[in-house]
Amino acid sequence: MPFFIILTARWRFGDYLLFIMETRTYDELKETPETKKNNARAALSEFAYLGGYKPWNFRKEALEYLAIKKALSEKWSFDGEAEDSYSILDNYLRYTFFRLFEENKIEYTKDGKWACFNTGLVNQTYVPIYALFQKNRNTGKQPWYFCAFIADGEKWGKFPDRCSVADFPRRPRRAQYLDNPSDLLYLVSEEKNELSLNFDHIFDRAERLPIDLLNELSGKQIPIKKQRGDFSNQIDYETYLSNYNDELQNVINEGNTRRRLQERFKTAVDMTRDRIVWNYKTAIPMYYPSTGKISLLLPLNLVKEDKVDLALVVSKGDGGYLAETIYPLNWAYRCARLICRPDSDWLTPSTITNDSEDEEDND
């Protein structure tokens, strides 16, 4: 039975780190609550060996083949990234797999030798593209290993070990995110659809706010947030983030800064609502993997009127819309891309830098 070594606890004693590890089978792992909450992104790597230099990464050649030669043309990297990083594509495939796993849409051949899932992507003639896996013969590893991206009518492998989509009892289906088409739209014409802002929760994520905005409203000079690469280990980085956020919270709660910040948000939201009236595509649907929720993304111009700084995450309830948190634009794009490629004039990878680290599981 394949098993995985899982980090379950860690403590720090002076300059030493103590790690507590345990082993679990794949079936045990997929049933644990933390898998859904914390490991949505890791689910595909736990399911299959992906062939990369690091075993949890795709081979670069595989992503390149999919992006350039197989799938309909699309930009899969953010501004400032190498074109061949394919960070958006990698993220898309991982969370698409997790959604399909939740929906029980991973398909298997009757002999148990092959597995397959629908990537949701299409080729130049709009034929669906699938990810194909073969049973892993290496014991103690992931139960499957990645073989190829194939379209309908294509076979992979050497005789007699060849496989196509037609060999599966059921054609792999796409991930489903929407039950109600109205979830795609932000309705501004009805009074019952007023937008409420949960400022307490929004400002709890103070490190996501533009530093220029906080400096302007507080009259201070706050240092720019450091990145993970500035620290030798994850624990030191997490400690720094906690302290940095506490510092920003103190700035927000001093004097009139909080009131000014709320007023700036309200002004930005008013402009966004006018923008939605002008173009309903301004509001972009997104899927939040760890909760399975559909929300809408709205642009927030907080510092300059001609520049979007953040995405406001809005959910619809019986009494209207509620804005509970804010996302950096790279997070927003990745979550939106799971549903479809955004047809947007404000959320495009060519104008977004990937300078916020992957913490989407923390809303």
Positions of PLM-derived features:
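Ser/Thr/Pro/Gly-rich low-complexity, intrinsically disordered segments
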Residues: 5-8
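An acidic, glycine-rich, mixed-charge low-complexity segment common to nucleic-acid enzymes
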Residues: 19-291
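Intrinsic-disorder-associated, low-complexity terminal segments enriched in Asp/Asn/His/Tyr and depleted
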Residues: 15-16
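Short acidic DE-rich linear segments
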Residues: 361-363
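Compact beta-sheet-dominated globular domain cores
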Residues: 293-359
